[in-house]
């Protein structure tokens, strides 16, 4: 399948595909229905069927362009289903809001769960403003696990942008993170704290189908992502109630309860006063293009209630095995996390004292401390210095030259060129912090 090590899910699904001739069944019948009892022959179904992002799918699914959807409480359909939606990449201004003065139990510097993020969003008026509802009329209603009810729908074939499959759902289990009802709407929320490129449409569609039949008012479906002090909220609508793939973005907005004001003078002050550090031994030069995801990984490690191994990072968040290596190594390179080994010799990641201190700081200090961590390294400091002098972002060739001048060890020029993209990504993140008007 791949030169990379197989996960437990990879191995278990390969056995099931062989045992039940799943590929042949799909090619002849269009789909294959597998029961929870059959899946349990190898592993617990809850571990084998939850793939919130395309990148999390087992290798045999990825290789054959397959996906899995629950259709009853104990059955799942496997086929060439187009089940994920790419987030729209739009940069938006951040709307500042505040918690009421009397709220003492919510610490905006330490929001560690989806539930806390939702509670803070309600208390600060974010939810009411986004939904265009009156704050005093907004009521938290249905949430948690429940039955989907019965409905049928069409879903696109992954090779063809048209609804080729018809599936029947009967009492599948669904989960709603939050629902808010006002005078005009019932709004169903899916909330996440991990950053990703896509999401599983089912997380919005199945709850929408259930509650569309139960209430007379309009039902909205909303995706909320909270990371690094910023809420990103997206409302989606389904143009055709019977078409799983008919969703489209209605609107999106960013909010923060914290003061997000950072000036270029703040950034220049960090650059001017930073103390350089030598390149760390035995930690590779970063190959992790999104610095937002480096931060997000640290947040997820901080809030984890269990030992966070490399396999759990790969299984639970929007990383494949290679990206888990890249992003954990990038955070280690900056001194934000450390790697140890458990009794099974699995890598385990925890925050360093520096990482914990930064993550529990207010928004401005947190961002500037992250800048400091980056700019302590010569290549990044020199890249930002050159950008500030010219106002023009460097090219990959420019960055390779800076890496060669810094005598970065252990990588050839071709690898330097690949890793130059991370330098450009991190410098772009620093520059984008400037929101001075």
Name every feature range the model reports, one short phrase each.
Residues 97-98, 175-191:
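Glycine-rich, often proline-containing surface loops adjacent to acidic residues and nearby aromatics
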Residues 71-154, 331:
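Long, mid-chain structured domain cores
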Residues 185-187, 192-199, 211-241:
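Nucleic-acid nuclease catalytic cores
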Residues 110-117, 167-174, 199-203:
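Phosphate/oxyanion-binding active-site loops and adjacent basic polyanion-contact surfaces
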Residues 191-215, 393, 399-407:
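Short, hydrophobic/π-rich interface segment
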Residues 1-111:
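Nuclease-adjacent, charged terminal/linker segments that flank catalytic cores
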Residues 245-437:
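Donor-sugar nucleotide-binding helix/loop cap in glycosyltransferases
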Residues 135-179:
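Active-site metal-binding core of divalent-cation-utilizing nuclease and nuclease-like domains
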